């Protein structure tokens, strides 16, 4: 059985695809997806005044997911937040948990949230972290191609194809990544 390391081009193709994604701004999938604040503009504005929420966002931006999850958890335990504000915080907490490799906690947090492309993506990342590659691949199919998260989904799909040693899926995914701009 051939492994991907014996192919002549996939490493170069993966590298070029990563460069394309980074050239798109290097933003995290959370930044690419429409925020919950689009649904609750006033709540989002009020929430931006919350120190723990600000610290959580800053920690995520600085790639400190464990610290971010702590800030978001403290923010959620606050008595003076409206339920609509807590609904804005929960996806950030779930993302931070997955990023911090607290996979089970993160998957449980996402399970409590309504279906969305962001939920599908982060659930797939969590399943990938657990080594459940086939289940992760299934979750990615729920992300529409028109959604900004689809680029991140394709990147993850390429990694999954590599782990599954599915050359055809890898080639298809890399081809779609090359066409996406």
Predicted feature residues:
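N-terminal leader/linker segments that initiate helical-solenoid repeat arrays
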Residues: 29-89, 95, 99-101, 108, ...
């Amino acid at each position: 059985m051939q492994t991907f390391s014996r192919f002549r081009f996939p490493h170069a193709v993966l590298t070029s695809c990563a460069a394309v994604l980074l050239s798109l701004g290097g933003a995290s999938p959370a930044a690419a997806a429409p925020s919950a604040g689009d649904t609750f503009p006033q709540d989002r504005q009020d929430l931006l005044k919350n120190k723990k929420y600000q610290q959580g966002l800053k920690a995520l931006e600085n790639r400190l997911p464990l610290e971010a999850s702590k800030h978001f958890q403290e923010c959620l335990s606050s008595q003076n937040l409206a339920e609509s504000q807590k609904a804005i915080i929960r996806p950030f907490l779930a993302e931070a948990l997955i990023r911090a490799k607290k996979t089970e906690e993160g998957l449980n947090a996402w399970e409590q949230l309504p279906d969305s492309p962001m939920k599908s993506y982060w659930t797939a990342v969590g399943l990938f972290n657990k080594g459940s590659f086939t289940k992760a691949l299934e979750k990615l199919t729920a992300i529409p191609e028109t959604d900004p998260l689809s680029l991140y989904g394709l990147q993850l799909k390429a990694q999954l194809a590599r782990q599954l040693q599915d050359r055809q899926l890898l080639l298809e995914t890399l081809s779609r990544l090359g066409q996406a701009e």
